[in-house]
């Protein structure tokens, strides 16, 4: 299997990385800490089949596999893990879940989104007017994009900062966000990962700047 140094990512670039890790275009490393199972297999959905990739276990309980040589992995590809040849389980460190936290996960290429937050300076403490926002109830749509459309109204009210209630992936359709299960993934009923990134940037550009 080919491997290389990880490319730059926003906002982190740690050496030890849970979940899918982009090593080079089309080449990804999958990491799971699971000390109890004897075997772990990566299952990757292709057009007409599910391809299996056995993972290598280290002495400290990490299972790892790097794939891409036999077919590039792309943004949005679906995957999960098979434990000891019997039980299919989602990635607890997935960046996106296809349906809910019990099913397939989706690869998220953070390089797909162009961050332009270099000008962000923050707001002086004395100038803070904070609006606490729950994405699901802030608009009729209940989505990240729906929230973006109403940001000008907050600016007109004098709001200078937005505090978003927790958006970690939860089971079910309705949730306040305080019992998130997929802690590395943004709630998919509000939209896709690029939508949540867009909301972050629009808040910075419309409210904070």
Residue ranges and their predicted role:
Residues 1-29, 50-132, 137-142, 153:
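The feature marks proteins involved in alpha-glucan
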Residues 127, 158-160, 206-208:
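Short, well-ordered coil/turn segments that N-cap beta-strands
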Residues 153-198:
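Aromatic-lined carbohydrate-binding/catalytic grooves of carbohydrate-active enzymes
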């Amino acid at each position: 299997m080919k491997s290389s140094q990880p490319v730059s990512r926003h906002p982190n670039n740690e050496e030890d990385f849970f979940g899918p890790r982009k090593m080079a275009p089309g080449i990804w490393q999958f990491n799971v800490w699971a000390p109890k199972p004897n075997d772990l297999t990566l299952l990757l959905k292709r057009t007409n089949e599910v391809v299996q990739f056995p993972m290598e276990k280290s002495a400290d309980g990490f299972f790892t596999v790097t794939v891409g040589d036999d077919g590039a992995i792309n943004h949005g590809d679906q995957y999960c893990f098979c434990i000891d040849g019997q039980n299919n389980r989602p990635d607890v460190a997935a960046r996106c879940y296809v349906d809910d936290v019990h099913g397939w996960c989706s690869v998220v290429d953070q390089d797909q989104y162009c961050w332009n937050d270099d000008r962000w300076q923050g707001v002086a403490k004395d100038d803070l007017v904070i609006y606490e926002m729950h994405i699901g109830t802030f608009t009729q749509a209940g989505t990240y994009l729906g929230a973006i459309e109403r940001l000008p109204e907050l600016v007109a009210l004098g709001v200078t900062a937005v505090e978003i209630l927790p958006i970690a992936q939860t089971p079910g359709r309705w949730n306040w966000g305080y019992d998130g299960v997929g802690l590395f993934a943004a709630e998919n009923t509000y939209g896709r990962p690029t939508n949540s990134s867009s909301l972050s940037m629009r808040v910075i550009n419309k409210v904070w700047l």
